[in-house]
Each structure stands twice: as structure tokens, then as C-alpha cells.
Amino acid sequence: MKDIPIHDKIDIISLRDAGIYDDIEETGETYEQNAIIKAKFATEKTGLPAFADDSGLEIRALNNKPGIYSARYLGEDTPYAVKMEHILAELKNKDRFACYKCAIAFVTPTGNVTTSMGILNGDIAFERSNGPYGFAYDKIFYIPDYQKTFADLPPEIKNKISHRAMALRNLFNHYVTI
């Protein structure tokens, strides 16, 4: 998220930048709940306002799977290449509509919690791209308006149109006063 321009008065540091390397267990049942868990953790550890996200890929023909379990789909240690090939095989002759969803939670040291959602609609491509950008499922997430997968879009475009960028813009434009 550090690469997405948010506001010129905000300096973003990651937990690692702050010397915090703890794993945060995502026990929520929604993107929003997981984002809140992570943001509260960061605020408790640093004493600073914090925001965190939780994101996932939802595929209509797969009953919105992998969803909040996107990173753990088919097992945490399963490489994304295997996960993507599995999805492509599952979608033979099926509806390919999909969306990336992102929930952002902003938590203050006084306990105020604000959340925002961003959704980017697209399709699952028919084959995996070799695009150099992105991670996770970006090589199979196709953006019809650009006629490219997310992995084929350069960062300057992705950082404007992504589900994370939408959620951040919404959060800072409507809810957070700086």
C-alpha cells in the first residue's frame, strides 16, 4: 500500500519499518473484520493511528471462492502458480466474472475505527499471463477496460484503479480528516 499515493501530509511506515515482525492471525469472517484486527494490532504496538487492509479474489462461478481465504486457498504453502492453474481448470466452460475486494480499516489510539471497501470487477483470463507486475492472482485477473491482466498493467495504472486504491481514496476522501 505504500506505493499508492494517499495524501501529501501522511508518512506511511510498515510494521517492519517500526521493527515489529509479529504475525497477525486473521481470525475474522470478513475482509473488514480482518482489516480491523490488523489495524488495531498496529495501533496497540505503535501507539500511532494505523490502517490495514484485507483483500481477496472472489469468483462468481466458484461461489465467491477463494474470498477471504485467498492467501490460504488450497493451503498456505501452496504456490500461487498452482492455485491459479487450479482455478483455471475449475472454470472450464463456466462464468468467468470475478472481483478483487479490499477492506481498509483505520484505527486511532483512542479506539475510533473507520472502514472502507474497494471493489475492482473483472474476469478470470483463459490462461495465465507472463506479465511482470503484481503478485498473487494478478496473472489471471483480467481487466476488460484495459484488455490486459492485472499483471500486465504497470504500477502507475494499477495504483490508480486497484481495489486497494479505491478503498484508500474512499477512506481518506470521506472519513479521515487530516
Where are these regions (language model features)?
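Anionic-ligand binding patches
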Residues: M1-I178
